[in-house]
Amino acid sequence: MKLVLIIGSGAVGKMTVGQELMKITDLRLFHNHMMIEPVIEIFNSFNGKVIQRLRDVVFEEFLKTDNEGMIFTVMWAFDMPSDLEYVLEVASKFDEVYCVELIADQSVRLERNKTGNRLANKASKRDLAASEQRLLNEEANHRLVSLPGEIPFENYLRIDNTLLAPDVVASMIKEKFSL
């Protein structure tokens, strides 16, 4: 089964590109906030342990299906060894892994942070001031862009999508990896 792992900083467009990629492939989208938002709603706070358990169940059950594969989006802090461990653990469950790193200028990401699609799918981002501050803090406190040679996957593509529409980026991914 295939895994297309879409990584990048906050509001870079991981979910939106994943949505577009799902439209043009037989892959299913599992974006990071599909587990985060219900947990915040139910527990009234972020609970990483519960989010992780739910993700694990989704992966376990999805791998039992006859789907072609999954698009999974996640923010990877390259200065956090635990993030690398998690990404490798997820990737190990799949037969084929394709890693796409999206990068975009901070000014563009701050604008994307306010888009209707993002706010419709991610209730935790609707307090725009708090969401913007989280985005800036994440960037200040973590390295969210890989260094050359740091991505441990043979099938890797970095795309600067600062000026690219999500459907164009999805087409680039599909073409590069013959999805």
Stretch-by-stretch model annotation:
Residues 106-113:
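Switch/connector loops and helix/strand junctions flanking conserved nucleotide-binding motifs
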Residues 50-106:
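Glycine-rich phosphate-binding loop used to anchor ATP phosphates in small-molecule kinases
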Residues 16-63:
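Conserved substrate/cofactor phosphate-moiety recognition/catalytic segment
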Residues 13:
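Conserved glycine(s) of the Walker
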Residues 119-169:
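Small-molecule kinase domains that catalyze NTP-dependent phosphoryl transfer to phosphate-bearing small molecules
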Residues 55, 59, 166-174:
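Short, amphipathic alpha-helical "lid/cap" segments that border enzyme active or binding sites
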Residues 1-4, 67-68:
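Pre-Walker A (Motif I) flank of P-loop NTPase domains
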Residues 6-8:
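Hydrophobic anchor at the beta1->P-loop junction of P-loop NTPases
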